Regions:
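Thiamine diphosphate
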Residues: 1-133, 161, 225, 287, 371-508, 518-520, ...
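Conserved thiamine diphosphate
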Residues: 104-153, 159, 191-197, 402-404, ...
Length: 576
């Protein structure tokens, strides 16, 4: 049977068909749907882990136990999982282990545009890269086989376009493998120096064998055109752009195995043409490899640069000098920047922080939008968990000057991911810092995934729920309080009180995400135009349900969830 599938959905199907038994991931766009889709198969155990490091260690443990395993994450998640990744490159596997890392070329939903191929190279872990949904499924299945053949975890690199675009996929039956035997082998899995030295020798020998495999594998294929004016070496989503933009005007070497890269295959292909262009998104890894192996008739980054995606129009203009028209919407869609939803519980908190003129150390989540107009409340956003650690450093640097006017904001899921250790640091090192945990009862930004505080697991079954108040107290924070961000006066008073204290404190701003299905909304509010004076104070909240018409505020009843923040804000009582 054939089916139209997203790349991530096809990836999940590949996990299922390959006989994968254990899946542990942390949600992160554009990788999230892989784990959500594979969780629908009863034959696969799937979970959300607290962070990517835990997910990778769980998958490695399952592999050592004899089960094919998988962990998935976005590109910045691989930074978090780098510690086990680099050592897993030494230990190798028992049963096959596959890692998905989804890069976000163009930074559609990310804080940086790093190229995950660097991690594969540095960790000496092989990496494959599909270009469409069919390849997603087939590459995953092959990755498990190669993982067991070469005794290595295999990374499959995804991109936003491949993950979230669709193509036809042939459905096949699941391969039931059973558990491989487990035998105690400390020289393989106990990475103390005496054993690790021997494994490093193994890794280098394995890399040589992988390079030999890269020379002949069908993953790397040459597509010769008799009308070719030049050659192109490409990979991933860029391959699709190349084929559409250049057609038969170029011969193409498509690299589906991007670490390690072949040598002779590239040399032989490049020798056929006076000029070869390397078209790869982000860093010039393939281009640099070409030059390292003596292929000097290549150009790449000097033409295409290091930033963002490489759409068909760019490739056609740069290489053919043509401004070609490609299938697209006739009219430009008006820009609609992301905003907090109507009724978002974070809005009231950020309004209070802005009103008080507080310096805010931000984090990763929906609440990052607190940095946008009209709230403009957040001063810094670095990475998961950095809000708390950064606050501690900020206050240690500036002392009393900042201690009573600076806070950290972090979501419940992000706090469980990597915020806890920062709070331990605050307690342990006697930091006079105020942390605000934005508890909206879900992992919101990536699409409502469960987390260790929600009381449910990935499949929706009951699970232990971490009590944030008790956890913060156990860490050593004596001042812990809960506020409702819909109540502006209460929230503002709590912030003032905790900032005035001479010890560390935690405010848990608790209100479920307004988009959760079980959340009951209040009747929508409306504006009494006779009372409205057009002061625009309600507009300062940045609620999408509120706009101005003929000098008066208007509330869209189809969007309003009745949170009441605007009513509390209105000084003339015009909102009823």
């Amino acid at each position: 049977m054939k089916k139209l599938m997203l790349g991530n959905e096809a990836f999940a199907r590949g996990l299922y068909e390959a006989g994968c038994k254990v899946v542990s991931s942390y949600p992160g766009t554009p990788s999230t749907e892989i784990t959500e889709e594979v969780a629908k198969y009863d034959e696969v155990y799937a979970e959300w882990a607290p962070n990517e490091k835990v997910a990778m260690e769980t998958a490695l443990g399952a592999s050592i136990a004899g089960a094919r395993s998988f962990c998935g994450m976005k590109h910045v998640g691989l930074n978090v999982a780098a510690d086990p990744l680099y050592t897993a490159g030494y230990t190798g596997v028992n049963a096959g282990m596959v890692i998905a890392v989804a890069d976000d070329q163009g930074m559609h939903s990310s804080q940086n545009e790093q190229d995950s191929r660097h991690h594969a190279i540095a960790s000496k872990v092989p990496m494959l890269e599909p270009s469409d949904s069919t390849e997603c499924k087939e590459f995953v299945k092959l990755a498990f086989e190669l993982s067991e053949k070469f005794d290595a975890p295999f990374i499959v690199r995804m991109s936003t376009r491949v993950a979230h675009s669709q193509s036809i996929v042939e459905m096949e039956d699941r391969q039931e493998l059973g558990l491989k035997p487990y035998e105690k082998t400390p020289q393989k899995f106990v990475m103390m120096p005496a054993y690790a030295k021997g494994r490093h020798v193994f890794v280098e020998e394995r890399t040589k064998k992988l390079i030999e495999y890269a020379e002949t594998t069908p993953l790397n294929r040459v597509e010769i055109s008799d009308k070719a004016e030049f050659g192109v070496i490409t990979n991933g989503a860029a391959y699709q752009y190349v084929k559409e933009a250049l057609g038969d005007k170029a011969s193409v070497l498509k690299l589906g195995m991007v670490n390690p890269l072949p040598e002779k295959l590239i040399q032989d292909f490049a020798a056929k043409y006076e000029q070869v262009y390397v078209i790869e998104e982000l860093d010039g890894i393939i281009e640099e490899h070409c030059r390292n192996i003596g292929v000097n008739n290549v150009k790449g980054k000097e033409i295409f640069g290091y930033i963002g995606e490489l759409p068909q129009s760019v490739i056609a203009e740069k290489l053919l000098g043509e401004k070609k028209e490609f299938a697209a919407l006739e009219d430009n869609i008006p820009v609609r920047p992301p905003v907090m939803c109507p009724g978002c519980p974070h809005r009231g908190l950020f309004y209070c922080l802005k009103k008080l003129g507080v310096t805010v150390s931000g984090d990763i989540g929906c609440y990052t939008l607190g940095a946008a107009a009209p709230l403009n409340a957040i001063d810094t956003t670095i990475c998961m968990g950095a809000s708390i650690s950064g606050l501690h450093g900020f206050n240690k640097a500036r002392g009393a000057e900042s201690e009573h006017n600076t806070v950290a904001v972090i979501g419940d899921s992000t706090f469980m991911h990597s915020g806890m250790t920062g709070l331990v640091n605050i307690a342990y090192n006697n930091s006079n810092s105020t942390v605000i945990i934005l508890d909206n009862s879900i992992t919101g930004m990536t699409g409502h995934q469960q987390n260790p505080t929600t009381g449910k697991n990935l499949k929706g079954d009951p699970a232990a729920a971490v009590n944030l108040e008790e956890l913060c107290k156990a860490i050593g924070i004596k001042r812990v309080r809960v506020t409702d961000p819909y109540k502006l006066a209460e929230t503002e008073a709590a912030i003032k009180e905790e900032l005035a204290a001479d010890e560390a404190s935690v405010i848990i701003s608790r209100r479920p995400c307004a988009l959760l299905k079980y959340v009951k909304h209040n009747p929508p509010f409306k504006v009494n135009t006779e009372k409205c004076v057009g002061c625009k104070m309600c507009m300062k909240l940045g609620c999408p349900a509120i706009s101005m018409r003929d000098g008066k505020a208007v509330i869209d009843h189809t969007q309003c969830v009745g949170c009441g923040i605007c009513k509390e804000q209105c000084k003339v009582g015009a909102i009823e």
